[in-house]
Structures are given as structure tokens and as C-alpha cells.
């Protein structure tokens, strides 16, 4: 896996800081929540406090941090009040008092209350420290404190005169909190500052930012990455030049003739020296994954790892030579040690190995670098073969063959005593040397004799030929034009071919199976990282959430190295898996909770344990979540929150969860559990726990009792629990309204006889029907009652036993509760008397409307329906049971009966309304009729037969007028002597409008007069089939009795009445309110009336 960046997320290290600063006798403390006024519950309890008092952590948690459960008879009442006052006012307090252990033994305690603030400056926690000072108090004798006056007078020392709490503050506790136990230089200034200066800084309960010196470099920072880039280039330069200078320059140039070092060599040495300095100030990642910022730790870590190698590689040979410092002739050979710096590049380059292009580029660079090294060594071997000859040159070396082909052979020249060169040459050498050959300037002697080696190919040709041989040997078996002749050359060629075979497979195999096996784990890590980044990019995850995802993935990978433990151990036998699980989870299984468990039970429980990981700021459990496991904190710290209030702080060794629930019970968490630092947990699944306890039932009761005492915080206390009942999920879909249920409860006193189960049910009311048509057909009084089914057993219905007054008066809320849909007045109600066949007209759905059960009628059966529900339209539930069908039938009958009664009430109301309209219109006609004079009454005031009336719209109000034809003909009736005046029949009335008649074959005669018409100039309003009458005389208009107009003539056509000039007057269907036919006088035309409808 690539080198990790380290765990750099901000963490709340308050608990770790307190735990590290408190040790020994000063570790007896509790932390109380200062945000819960009045109670200040304990959210954390140290192990030392439990050992001191004898109480377990579970017994102390959520109690008051004043530790009133430790009070006893000898505890000073004054100190109690002062402790309570200090907690309420969020102030520091210190006192000495007597407390009692759980066993009842008293002990002197030095109590110190210290408020802890958060990042907002608010007091978030109380640190209550307890120190046992019984030995100090009892030095004069075990009962010395009693002889001096008892406990209450002496133990309230904090309230005595002259006591200063600030001056008597516990130096040990505060020094531990502020880190003053470290050695500090002694001086007067620092002593005065520590005594009279400001108080030491206490740790704050907040998310701590990364603190580091400005002179400390982050190992994954941008500055360090840039510096590593320069070091990479310098290392590659060293890897190329050092082998060349060692193999080529040493062989062909004397050491005294070497020139000054180049600028690049000096710059590289300076970079290596500065790199050593920076490494002492660069952070590193510890084995636990934490980033170390302490300078001392950084220096110690660097000295024990790479320091020695970097010092040897950074020896400034070239720099000393530049300053004319005499260096040993072979000292520059130590430069080869710098090649070891390539090992340092591997961890740094590993982060780029997930990119295939970078991998191929690096492999090609490594292959070329290796070929360069092989070429240098091959040239050095050939040169040494020539110089090793004592008296004559060898003729089988590869350089000798190259010299003959290039016609630049080697030759030996004897050196004369005066320093000149002799002309004696060996017979196989040419007489002249090439001035262009680099060997012409050499001054080396052969074998210490007076012979000097000259001639040979140039250095450029020799190196290119060596590189050609190296590449041909590494990539294949070579072509033979440059071959190994001597034994030394052949041995080196063999090694080169072996290396070449490996490099050929790695580079030209394009990362095949060998590479996949070598980097399988790395590929898996990069593959998952790439998938995670692609997921983040596709779904546009915000940056904070993206960082949390990457941090969690890297942290979990560091814990398990990408190994799926479940899949890995699945192939192993159960016996071996149990032993491995017990070894992995031995820290959890060593808890007192599992002391009574047998080894078999422990093995079963270990298989149910799973590792878990939580990063800072992550919620392990949310309030209201179903608790499915118990969690044991192995490392790190967490906090329990509820509504932003800290209820508990959990550290290493704490157990969180709930008491053992039943197998079908679901327990909901009553608080949130949030990680403060990187936490490693062990998770015990409740499902696996139940299975294990089912196998070992003798351990279940003891485990359940012990779990209550071991839980650091019970997340199930007061939580919501529910029994999982799968039977409630399967049931018949019954449509039953609430009002029906209430009515059923209220009618339990009535006798209900269920209908036979084999009777078919009629359809329900279709929801797709229009409100008008559905309601009209439902309200039809001619709808036939359910007919008895032949051959069926009749059962008395509920309607037969109802009281006679069980009508509308018996149900005062029936009329208001009847939610009838609105019906427009211009649409006549559908009063069809036909029997409903299950599918109504005008519906958008073919679903059935009503469900009737037809039974055999008996003497007690009633055809009138029973009162129904108050929910408006009927909702008849369907059910498989016979009793439910019977109740549905009875309710339907009651609803139909109630609707019939309401229709009768509406009929009576309409009649009353008709009479009221007559009383209103008749007086208006007497005084405002435009046709009558001031002395004579309006003709409309006289009662007569049912005749078409005319509405005058020219006046301020409407009045009814008789038709002109009847007045002219003298047919308007007058009262006869001795007889009451005939009743005037009401007529459909309303203001004129612009629409046609809503009903066919129906005619009403309307006329309209205005103020512009002269009196008496009104046109006759007669049917089109009636001939026009002659003009009437004035006397005849007042006294004449017109002939009655038959109803057949009035209704023989459906055309609207003609207006002035023979034009038809339009109907007004929107203003037409009602159509009612009154009583008939003697001699009048008898109007037909539909039975039961009032029309």
C-alpha cells in the first residue's frame, strides 16, 4: 500500500489529554456535564475513582458530579452547600471533607472542582478531582481527627476564616493539567511568574486544530513535495554520472589529470546536505497512523532510519576538491554509495503507481538506467583485459576487435629514460596512431614497465558500442557482432542475459501476470480508490463529505490492509476460525462480563464479533436508530449526545449499547454516539448474540445481569421498543370509516342478525361517477327495495326492531352530517324508477356502486332502510366474515331510510318556500303593476286558474300578470257571490334570461315590459300554436272573464314563448329555482303529479 498521508482530521483530544496528565493518585476524577443545570450528571469516570470509592462505572454514570452518593453522617453540611454553589455558579472550588466508600468506610478527601470551557468560552464540563488524604490527616493516630473535635467543625475548612481557595489550590492537579511537571530552568523570573502570575491554561473541550511549529514541514505538504522533486532529479543525475565516472574516467585518465568538478556536481552535493537538515524538521507517520509533530520524536526517528545513509551519500568530495583540499585518490569511489538513495525514491514514487502511464514511464527509465550501468561495466571489463597484458596486447578482447574494425588498433610504446617515446612497436600494431583517438594522450604504464598503451577507439565509439551490447543482451540474446571472447566477458554476458530476461518480461510484457501478482494488493487499493473518486465525481459529492469518505477509506485500509476477513476465513474450518476469532478479540472476551462463560460459549461469541472503525465527527449511532449491536471501544474516545447535550464521554474499555432485548424486540437508541478521535471498536451483533445464548442457555441469565453493570451508557434506557408482529401485515383490505365504527359501538344494544354467507353482494358506489347523477339516483324514492331471495333463509333485520321515532329526530346530527354533493338547479334530478343493475349511467368507471344482501323477508323485515352513517356517501366494507356482511347490510338499510326521511323533509320545506314566495310577490304586484291604474288592483292579485303568467321587468320588482288574451276574452276568473275566491295556481317564475328551456316539451310564457312602453301596450304572450286575439276593450280588460287556456295547448310544444314582434324569448335556466304545482280549484285543469315527488 502507498505511504499514508496520516490521520490529519481535527480531533477532540480532551479525554486523552486528561488521561495522560493524570496519573497515580491524581487519576481519581469524574467529568460532569455543566450544561444540565441542577443535576450536572457524570459523563466520564476514571478507573482510579472506581478503585477509590468501590463503585463501578455503570453505577457512577449519570449521577451528579457532586458525588452526593459518597456523603455520610460526618460529611460537613457547609461543604455540601459550597460545592453546590460552586457548581451552580461555574466557579472553581477546593475543600477537604469526609466521604464514604461503597463499603461504608470513611476517608478524608481533597476535592477540587475545576470548570472546563469549550471553544465558545462556555463552561461545558466540570472536572471533579478526588484525592485520598487520610494518611496525612491520621498521622497522629487513627482517631486523631475525632479527638480534635469531630468531623463537621474541622472538615469545613474551606469556609473557615482566613482560608484562601486560590492559594490552597492543588499544585499537583493543576500542574498535571497544565503540563508543568516537565523540567524547567530555575530562575527568579519564572518562579515569580508561576506563583504570582496568571493561572495555568486548562485543556478545553473542543475540536483541537493541528498544532505545529512554523519551522516544521508537513511530509505531505506542497513545499515538501517540491523539494522532493529536486531531490529526485539530483538522485537521477547521481545514478547516471557516478557509474560513468567510476568505470570510464578511472580506466582512461590518471587521477592527477582529473579536472575540477562541474557545477552540477557541486549543486547536487549542496542539495544532499540541505536535505539532511530538512529531514530533521519534517513530520512522519507513526505505526499507529498518527502524524508526529514533536521535533524530538522527529529527530530520533530520522537518526534511526535514513540518517547514516544520507550522510555517506552527501560526503562533499567534489566540494573539497574545489577548495584545493587533498583528497585520497580513491575517495571518489565512495560516490557509489549515493546510489542507495534510489531506495528512498520508492516510497515517494509509489503514490504515482496507480497511473498506468507513469508506471510505464518509470519502467522504461529503470530499464534505460540499468542498460547504462551494464554498458559502463562492460567497457570497464574490456579496458581491464587490455591493460592486464604483461608484454603484448591480447587479440581476443571486444575492444581489440572494435579497434581493428575501426582501424584504430592499440599499440605499446616504450618510454625512454629522457622521457621520450621509442618507435619500437609490436608487429601486430600499426606504425602510426590516430591523432583523433582518445588513447593518444594517455600516460598510463602497462604493468609498471616502461611500456605505454596508446591508440584504440575513441571514448565515444567505445561507450556507444558498450551500450549497444547492453541493450541487445537485455532485450534478447544478442546479434553476435559484439561478442564476449574472454572468460570474464562471458561470465558478465551470462549475468546480463539473466537480468535482460527479467527486464524484458517486466517492460515489454506490458504489466502482465507477473506484475499483477507483484502488485495485486496495490492494484486493489488503487482500484477501490479510483472507484470511490469516480463515484464522488459522478454524484457530485460536496467537498466536506468527499474528504470524510476518503479519510474513512484510508483509515479502514490502514487497519485491515484491504483484507476481507470474512471472505478470507470463510474457507477455513469452524474450529480454526473460532480459534483465530478468539485471538483477534481476546481483549473483549477478557471483560468481567464473560468470566462465567464456558470456552465453547466464548468461541461462539467470538464468531459474532466484528471490527468497526469511526473517524472524528462521524456518528456511530443516531438517536432513534434500531440498536443492532453492542460496541466495545478498543481505542480512541467518543461522546454521547442528546439534543446537543453531552451525556457521556467514552474511552478505551467502555461498553455501549442496551440491555439484552428479547429476540423479536426492537430497541431504539435514545441518544447519538459520535466519534471524537479515530476509534477502533469491536461490534457484537445482537443476532449472533441471541444465537450464541440459545446454544448456551445457562449463561444467558448471568450475561443479562452482568450487562447492566458493565454498560458505560445504556442507549436503550427509555428508548422506544416495539414487538415485530408480522401477522398484522397480512389482512383483508376492509373499507370501514371511523363513523361506522363509532356507530357500531353505539348500536351494540340492538339485535343484529347476520345475513346468510352465501348471498351475493352488490357493487359499491363507483368513485368515478359524477356527484349529480349519483346523488340523484340515490335519492330517487321509487328505487325498489331489495327483493327477497328465493329459497334463502330469512333473518329479521335491524329495521324491524327499531323504534318508530328513530327518524331524523332520533339522529340530530344526521342532516348536518349528510355530505350530499351539490346539484345545480338547472339539471333536473334523475328520478328514474328503474332498478339499479350495478352500473350507473354517467359514470367513468364500471365498478359497482352498492352492496346489497337480499334475504328472505319475514314478518319482522322492513323494506324501509335503516339509518346509515354520518359520513356522506355510503362506504360499504367488504369482508370475508358473515357478521361483517350482516352489519354492512343493516347500515345500508338504515342509510337509505334516513335519506328517504330527509327527502320528505326537503319536500315539506319546498312547499313552505312556495307559499312564502306567493306572499312576497302578491303585495308587490298590487302597488307596482304598470298595467293597472291607481284605483284598480292588478289583475294578478285575483286568484284564478293555473295560467301562464308574465313577469314585468321594467318595474323595480317583479310582478305576475295574467295573459292579455284571457283578459280580452273575459275568461279571467272573478269571485262568485257566496263562494270563496279561487286559488291562484303558482307558476314557474324567475327573471328572463338568454338560454333555452332545460326540459323538452315544457313551455313557460314570459314577457318583458319596460318604462318606455305605454301602459296597455304589452304584447300577448301566447304559444305559437294559439292564434292572436283581437284587441280588448278597457272594460273588458277589467271585467271580462277570459277563457281558460288548456294545459295541453300550453305544453304542446317545447319551443320557448314568443316575445315582442314574434321573437322567441329565451329561458333562464341559471335563475330557475323550483318547479312546483299547487292545489287545484274547482273547474280548473287537473295537473298530473308524479307520485311521491311533489312535481
Curated annotation (Swiss-Prot):
Membrane-crossing residue ranges in chain numbering: 229-249, 260-280, 303-323, 332-352, 362-382, 491-511
The UniProt entry lists membrane topology as: Multi-pass membrane protein
Q: Extract the Gene3D superfamilies matched here.
A: 1.10.1200.260, 1.10.287.70, Jelly Rolls, PAS domain
- Main localization is membrane
Q: Where is the composition biased (Basic and acidic residues)?
A: 137-150
Entries under InterPro entries matching the protein? cNMP-bd_dom (IPR000595), cNMP-bd_dom_sf (IPR018490), Ion_trans_dom (IPR005821), K_chnl_volt-dep_EAG/ELK/ERG (IPR003938), K_chnl_volt-dep_ELK (IPR003950), KCNH_animal-type (IPR050818), PAC (IPR001610), PAS (IPR000014)
> Can you provide one Gene Ontology molecular function annotated for this UniProt record?
inward rectifier potassium channel activity
Chain positions covered by the region annotation Disordered: 137-161, 417-447, 740-823, 854-883, 965-1069
Extracellular topological domain: 250-259, 324-331, 383-464, 486-490
Domain (PAS): give its ranges: 18-90
The residue numbers the entry assigns to motif Selectivity filter are: 476-481
> Which locations, inside or outside the cell, does it occupy?
Cell membrane
Compositionally skewed regions (Basic residues) per UniProt: 784-796
Q: How is it modified after translation?
A: N-glycosylated. N-glycosylation mediates traffick to the cell membrane but is not necessary for voltage-gated potassium channel activity.
Binding-site list for a nucleoside 3',5'-cyclic phosphate: 593-708
Cell division keyword on record: no
The role this protein plays is:
Pore-forming (alpha) subunit of a voltage-gated inwardly rectifying potassium channel. Charactherized by a fast rate of activation during depolarization followed by a rapid inactivation at much more depolarized value causing inward rectification due to a C-type inactivation mechanism. Exhibits a rapid recovery from inactivation.
The record's family statement is: Belongs to the potassium channel family. H (Eag) (TC 1.A.1.20) subfamily. Kv12.2/KCNH3 sub-subfamily.
Tell me what this protein is called.
Voltage-gated inwardly rectifying potassium channel KCNH3
Amino acid at each position: 500500500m502507498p505511504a499514508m498521508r496520516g490521520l490529519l482530521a481535527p480531533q477532540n483530544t480532551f479525554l486523552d489529554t486528561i488521561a495522560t496528565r493524570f496519573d497515580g493518585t491524581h487519576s481519581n476524577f469524574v467529568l460532569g456535564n455543566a450544561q444540565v443545570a441542577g443535576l450536572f450528571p457524570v459523563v466520564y469516570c476514571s478507573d482510579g475513582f472506581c478503585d477509590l470509592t468501590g463503585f463501578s462505572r455503570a453505577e457512577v454514570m449519570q449521577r451528579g458530579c457532586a458525588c452526593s452518593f459518597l456523603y455520610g453522617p460526618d460529611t460537613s453540611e457547609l461543604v455540601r452547600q459550597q460545592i453546590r454553589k460552586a457548581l451552580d455558579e461555574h466557579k472553581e472550588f477546593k475543600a477537604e471533607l469526609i466521604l464514604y466508600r461503597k463499603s461504608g468506610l470513611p476517608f478524608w478527601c481533597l476535592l477540587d472542582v475545576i470548570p472546563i470551557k469549550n471553544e465558545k468560552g462556555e463552561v461545558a464540563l466540570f472536572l471533579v478531582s478526588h484525592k485520598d488524604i487520610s494518611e496525612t490527616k491520621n498521622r497522629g493516630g487513627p482517631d486523631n481527627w475525632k479527638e480534635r473535635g469531630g468531623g463537621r467543625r474541622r472538615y469545613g475548612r474551606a469556609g473557615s476564616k482566613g482560608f484562601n481557595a486560590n492559594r490552597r489550590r492543588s499544585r499537583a492537579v493543576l500542574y498535571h493539567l497544565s503540563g508543568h511537571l516537565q523540567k524547567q530552568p530555575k530562575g527568579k523570573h519564572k518562579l515569580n511568574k508561576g506563583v504570582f502570575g496568571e493561572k495555568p491554561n486548562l485543556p478545553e473541550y473542543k475540536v483541537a486544530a493541528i498544532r505545529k511549529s512554523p519551522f516544521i514541514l508537513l511530509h505531505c505538504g506542497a513545499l515538501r513535495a517540491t523539494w522532493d522533486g529536486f531531490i529526485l532529479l539530483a538522485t537521477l543525475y547521481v545514478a547516471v554520472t557516478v557509474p560513468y565516472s567510476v568505470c570510464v574516467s578511472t580506466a582512461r585518465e590518471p587521477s592527477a589529470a582529473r579536472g575540477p568538478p562541474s557545477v552540477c556536481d557541486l549543486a547536487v552535493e549542496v542539495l544532499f546536505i540541505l536535505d539532511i537538515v530538512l529531514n530533521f524538521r519534517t513530520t512522519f507517520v507513526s505505526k499507529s497512523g498518527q502524524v508526529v509533530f514533536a521535533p524530538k520524536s522527529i529527530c530520533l526517528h530520522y537518526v534511526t532510519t535514513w540518517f547514516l545513509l544520507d550522510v555517506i551519500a552527501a560526503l562533499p568530495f567534489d566540494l573539497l576538491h574545489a577548495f584545493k583540499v587533498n583528497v585520497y585518490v580513491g575517495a571518489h569511489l565512495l560516490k557509489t554509495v549515493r546510489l542507495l538513495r534510489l531506495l528512498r525514491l520508492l516510497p515517494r514514487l509509489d503514490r504515482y503507481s496507480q497511473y498506468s502511464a507513469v508506471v510505464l514511464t518509470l519502467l522504461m527509465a529503470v530499464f534505460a538506467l540499468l542498460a547504462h550501468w551494464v554498458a559502463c561495466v562492460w567497457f570497464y571489463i574490456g579496458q581491464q583485459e587490455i591493460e592486464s597484458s604483461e608484454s603484448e596486447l591480447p587479440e581476443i578482447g571486444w575492444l581489440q576487435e572494435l579497434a581493428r574494425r575501426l582501424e584504430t588498433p592499440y599499440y605499446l610504446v616504450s618510454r625512454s629514460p629522457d622521457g621520450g617515446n621509442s618507435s619500437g612497436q609490436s608487429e601486430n600494431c600499426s606504425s602510426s596512431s590516430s591523432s583523433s583517438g582518445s588513447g593518444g594522450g594517455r600516460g598510463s604504464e602497462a604493468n609498471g614497465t616502461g611500456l605505454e598503451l596508446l591508440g584504440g577507439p575513441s571514448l565515444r565509439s567505445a561507450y556507444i558500442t558498450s551500450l549497444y551490447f547492453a541493450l541487445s543482451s537485455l532485450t534478447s540474446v544478442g546479434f553476435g557482432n559484439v561478442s564476449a571472447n574472454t572468460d570474464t566477458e562471458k561470465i558478465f554476458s551470462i549475468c546480463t542475459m539473466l537480468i535482460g530476461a527479467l527486464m524484458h518480461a517486466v517492460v515489454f510484457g506490458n504489466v502482465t501476470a507477473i506484475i499483477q501478482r507483484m502488485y495485486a494488493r496495490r492494484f486493489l487499493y488503487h482500484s477501490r480508490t479510483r472507484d470511490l473518486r469516480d463515484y464522488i465525481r459522478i454524484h457530485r459529492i460536496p467537498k466536506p463529505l468527499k474528504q470524510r469518505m476518503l479519510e474513512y477509506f484510508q483509515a479502514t485500509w490502514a487497519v485491515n490492509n484491504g483484507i476481507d476477513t470474512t471472505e478470507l476465513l470463510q474457507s477455513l474450518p469452524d474450529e480454526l476460525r473460532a480459534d483465530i476469532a478468539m485471538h483477534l478479540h481476546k481483549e473483549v472476551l477478557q471483560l468481567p462480563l464473560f468470566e462465567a462463560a464456558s470456552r465453547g460459549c466464548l468461541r461462539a461469541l467470538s464468531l459474532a464479533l466484528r471490527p468497526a472503525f469511526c473517524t472524528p465527527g462521524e456518528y456511530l449511532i443516531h438517536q432513534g436508530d434500531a440498536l443492532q449491536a453492542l460496541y466495545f471501544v478498543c481505542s480512541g474516545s467518543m461522546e454521547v449526545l442528546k439534543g446537543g447535550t453531552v451525556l457521556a464521554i467514552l474511552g478505551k474499555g467502555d461498553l455501549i449499547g442496551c440491555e439484552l432485548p428479547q429476540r423479536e424486540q426492537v430497541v431504539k437508541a435514545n441518544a447519538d454516539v459520535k466519534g471524537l478521535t479515530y476509534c477502533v471498536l469491536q461490534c457484537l451483533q445482537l443476532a449472533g448474540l441471541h444465537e450464541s445464548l440459545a446454544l448456551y442457555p445457562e449463561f444467558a441469565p448471568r450475561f443479562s445481569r452482568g450487562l447492566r453493570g458493565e454498560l458505560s451508557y445504556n442507549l436503550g434506557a427509555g428508548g422506544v421498543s416495539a414487538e415485530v408482529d408480522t401477522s398484522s401485515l397480512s389482512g383483508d383490505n376492509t373499507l370501514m370509516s371511523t363513523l361506522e365504527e363509532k356507530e357500531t359501538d353505539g348500536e351494540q344494544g340492538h339485535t343484529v342478525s347476520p345475513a346468510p354467507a352465501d348471498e351475493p353482494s352488490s357493487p359499491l358506489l363507483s368513485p368515478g361517477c359524477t356527484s349529480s347523477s349519483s346523488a340523484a339516483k340515490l335519492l330517487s324514492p321509487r328505487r325498489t327495495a331489495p327483493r327477497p331471495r328465493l329459497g334463502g333463509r330469512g333473518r329479521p333485520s335491524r329495521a324491524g326492531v327499531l323504534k318508530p321515532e328513530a327518524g331524523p329526530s332520533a339522529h340530530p346530527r344526521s342532516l348536518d352530517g349528510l355530505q350530499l354533493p351539490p346539484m345545480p338547479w338547472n339539471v333536473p334530478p334523475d328520478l328514474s324508477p328503474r332498478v339499479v343493475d350495478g352500473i350507473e349511467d354517467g359514470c367513468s368507471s364500471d365498478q359497482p356502486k352498492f352492496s346489497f344482501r337480499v334475504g328472505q323477508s319475514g314478518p319482522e323485515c322492513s323494506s324501509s332502510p335503516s339509518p346509515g352513517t354520518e359520513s356522506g356517501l355510503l362506504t360499504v366494507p367488504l369482508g370475508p366474515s358473515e357478521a361483517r356482511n350482516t352489519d354492512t347490510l343493516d347500515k345500508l338499510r338504515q342509510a337509505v331510510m334516513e335519506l328517504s326521511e330527509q327527502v320528505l323533509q326537503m319536500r315539506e320545506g319546498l312547499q313552505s318556500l312556495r307559499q312564502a314566495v306567493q306572499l312576497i310577490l302578491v303585495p308587490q304586484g298590487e302597488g307596482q303593476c304598470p298595467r293597472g291604474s291607481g284605483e284598480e288592483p292588478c289583475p294578478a292579485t285575483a286568484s284564478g286558474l293555473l295560467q301562464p303568467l308574465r313577469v314585468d321587468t321594467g318595474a323595480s320588482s317583479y310582478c305576475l300578470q295574467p295573459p292579455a288574451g284571457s283578459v280580452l276574452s273575459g275568461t279571467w276568473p272573478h269571485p262568485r257571490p257566496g263562494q270563496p275566491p279561487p286559488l291562484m295556481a303558482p307558476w314557474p317564475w324567475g327573471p328572463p334570461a338568454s338560454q333555452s328551456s332545460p326540459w323538452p316539451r315544457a313551455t313557460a310564457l314570459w314577457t318583458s315590459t319596460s318604462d318606455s312602453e305605454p301602459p296597455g301596450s304589452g304584447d300577448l304572450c301566447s304559444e305559437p300554436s294559439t292564434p292572436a286575439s283581437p284587441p280588448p276593450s278597457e272594460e273588458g280588460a277589467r271585467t271580462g272573464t277570459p277563457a281558460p287556456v288548456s294545459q295541453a295547448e300550453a305544453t304542446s310544444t317545447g319551443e320557448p314563448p314568443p316575445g315582442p314582434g314574434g321573437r322567441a324569448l329565451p329561458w333562464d335556466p341559471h335563475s330557475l329555482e323550483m318547479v312546483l304545482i299547487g292545489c287545484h280549484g274547482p273547474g280548473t285543469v287537473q295537473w298530473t303529479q308524479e307520485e311521491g315527488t311533489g312535481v
